[in-house]
Structure formats: C-alpha cells, structure tokens
A protein has these predicted regions:
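Active-site-proximal loop/hinge segments that shape catalytic or ion-binding/gating pockets
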Residues: 7-8
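A short C-terminal boundary segment appended to hydrolase-like catalytic domains
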Residues: 69-183
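Conserved beta-sheet core of the metallophosphoesterase superfamily
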Residues: 14-75
Length: 183
C-alpha cells in the first residue's frame, strides 16, 4: 500500500502517476493506493515490454467520521493470485464498494457493502446533518461509484469484477517452484 496523493480528488494526480510509472518500470505487479479519502479508479497499466501492473489508485475510506458525502464511500480490494509452472500472475480482480453509516445521536459508525445499502439506511445516515450533505442518498452513492470505476463496474451487482485473459496478467516468470509470491 502506498501513495501520498491529493486528498478528495477522484482521479490520480501527477504524484500517483510518477510512482505508478516507477513501480511499473521496476517490475512491480500490484499497487494498492491509499490516502485521498475518496475512491479512485482501478486499472491495469503496461509498459512497452508488455509487463502489466494492476493499480488500485485509492480505496477511499473504509470507515470515516469525516463530514462530506464522497468520503463515506470506499472499497474493498480483492484479487486472485496464481502461481503455476509458468510463474505468478493476477487471474482476476475485484472492488466491492462500501458505505460508512454514521448513526444519528450516537457515536457509532459501521460499514455496509453498497450492494446491501438501502435508501432507508441512506436517509438515516448522520452525514445528512453535515453542511451540504442533506441530499446524501443511495442514488448519490451508486452514481459516484459508477462515475469513478467506469464501464467495468456492474451496477446490478454493485461490484467491479474483471477476469483477465486465460494466462492472467502480471506474469512473473522469474518465480521458481521454491519462490512463490508475486511482487
């Protein structure tokens, strides 16, 4: 996990782009970014030699007591890493959006998967008491997540699920039978 990036911005900044290119040039296979307090895109980047790297630019907040609507949205990353006779690779990846639920009149916070979140829960989220947040809703969350994650995001399941080509991506052919982890 890394990246120090611009807070509250939904797209990678120049600092993230610099580190992404550096890690790609060093043969890194997967990067999971944090810090901006908002969800950012997930993508596969590649270099001119064909090396591919999976990048979660920012998972946003998993739990937050901040006072703005976008900061209530985060994500859980999941990927399948495979090691076989050809090396190590990422077979598929996923992002499950989550919503922070602040309870009115209590110092209690919990997290829901977006797929389990309802309009009733959204209308009861104490974020609605904060300035500029009275219109926080399930629809707001769904729209923002779709905007950030793009075409691979499945609104019907509230998930980003990507299966890669049969050989996976991020092949690390330097792996041997005695050395088994992706970088």
């Amino acid at each position: 996990m890394l990246f120090r990036s611009t807070e509250y911005v939904y797209t990678p900044d120049s600092n993230q782009n610099y580190w992404t290119q550096l890690f790609l040039s060093l043969g890194v296979d997967v990067v999971i970014g944090t810090h901006p307090h908002v969800l950012e895109p997930v993508e596969v980047v590649s270099d001119t030699k064909g090396h591919e790297m999976l990048v979660y630019y920012s998972l946003g907040n998993f739990v937050s007591n901040q006072d703005q609507k976008p900061r209530m949205i985060g994500g859980m990353a999941k990927m399948t890493l495979v090691k076989d006779e050809t090396g190590c690779y990422v077979k598929n990846y996923n992002l499950t959006p989550v919503i922070t639920q602040k309870l009115f009149g209590q110092k209690a916070i919990t997290t829901y998967k977006l797929s389990d979140y309802t309009e009733s829960l959204a209308s009861g989220n104490a974020i609605r008491n904060d300035s500029g947040c009275s219109d926080f809703s399930l629809s707001y969350c769904q729209t923002l997540v779709k905007q950030i994650l793009g075409d691979d995001y499945d609104e019907s399941t509230s998930e980003l699920n990507v299966s890669l080509h049969p050989d996976g991506l991020v092949k690390d052919t330097s792996a041997t039978e005695s050395s088994s982890s992706a970088k």
